[in-house]
Design a protein with these regions (language model features):
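Hydrophobic alpha-helical transmembrane signal-anchor segments
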Residues: 19-46
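Soluble non-transmembrane domains of integral membrane proteins
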Residues: 53, 57, 64-65, 74, ...
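N-terminal, polar/Ser/Thr-rich
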Residues: 17-18, 36, 57, 63-64, ...
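N-terminal Lys/Arg-rich, disordered targeting/topogenic segments
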Residues: 1-19
Length: 304
């Protein structure tokens, strides 16, 4: 009998030890299981990141060959005037620049979109036909206090900026009153940004007329999005496209929109009071340019 009790007591000791360490064992087992589950999760996350990088590369490659997303700034007028200064008793003459933005900037655009494929990835691109109408006047220029007599109206530049000039499909011209001017590549140091086109024009008539109406058309390619800078005292944009999943972006949302399964139309109106810069910029700087860039708005052609 004593031997039986001793055997039972001996069996209780391992059982007690197991109970004491059972919680620790459970924690260790759970930790091992969690680690085993994390391994495929990390692998999946790495795969997602790699797919994301590959998609970005595919979009960049197609966009570089077709044309980048376009942001359009213009048209506007650059006027130059002589600036006389004295340095060490010597008189120096440099060139000052004044930018004059239009009183009205009305843009009507038709866009035809399509999807290009690069491997398993899709990139949205478009071809657009844009019509720009409006007018310039000297009203705001007179308010700015600049010396109109010093301005070289006979050598004014009509400036038009866009992001990627490869998207231009045909020659661009602008009609001012009854005169037509052809644009030249580059800005020749006359514009807000370095990328775009300009046309040298004799705008002496602007001093004589209260209004100088303009009209221009452009066929432009781009990818993913199109945006506009609201340079007009009143800017109105009307866009239509065969795209059913637009994402309206930028500093202003459209006042009216109509989106269906296959297309959309949208209208914006932006006043000069809605932005942080005036109709005239005298010897503009980086801060002025940043204000213009930050005021742009438009649409992103989102792939569903």
């Amino acid at each position: 009998m004593d031997n039986l009790n001793e055997n039972l007591n001996g069996m209780e000791k391992p059982a007690g030890c197991f109970r004491r360490f059972s919680k620790t064992i459970k924690v260790v087992v759970i930790a091992v299981l969690v680690l085993l589950l994390l391994i495929p999760m990390v692998m999946i996350e790495d795969m997602i990141r790699e797919r994301g990088r590959t998609q970005v590369d595919a979009i960049e490659e197609v966009s570089q060959k077709w044309s980048l997303a376009q942001t359009i700034t213009g048209p506007y007028i650059n006027l130059q005037y002589p600036v006389v200064s004295v340095d060490n008793g010597k008189q120096k003459v440099s060139i000052g620049n004044v930018l004059l933005f239009p009183d009205e900037l009305f843009i009507d655009g038709q866009l035809r979109t399509e999807i290009l494929k690069r491997g398993i990835y899709e990139v949205n691109v478009y071809q657009s036909e844009l019509v720009f109408k409006g007018s310039f006047s000297l009203e705001e220029l007179k308010k700015s206090g600049v010396d109109l007599d010093a301005m070289r109206f006979d050598r004014a530049a009509i400036c038009f900026n866009l992001t990627d000039m490869r998207g231009i499909n045909e020659q661009i011209s602008i009609m001012l009153n009854d005169s037509v001017y052809m644009f030249e590549p580059g800005m020749d140091g006359r514009g807000i940004k370095g990328t775009g086109v300009h046309a040298v024009a004799d705008l002496t008539a602007l001093k004589e007329n209260k209004k100088l109406p303009y009209e221009m058309k452009i066929k432009l390619k781009g990818s993913q999005s199109i945006n506009f800078s609201p340079l007009g005292k009143t800017t109105k944009v009307n866009l239509k496209a065969n795209w059913g999943t637009p994402s309206f972006t930028g500093n202003y949302l459209p006042d009216n929109r109509n989106v269906t399964e296959n297309d959309f139309s949208a209208q914006w109106q932006v006043l000069n009071l809605n932005r942080n810069y005036s109709q005239v910029m005298v010897d503009y700087n980086t801060s002025n340019i940043k204000d213009i860039e930050n005021s742009s708005f438009g649409v992103n052609f989102k792939i569903p």
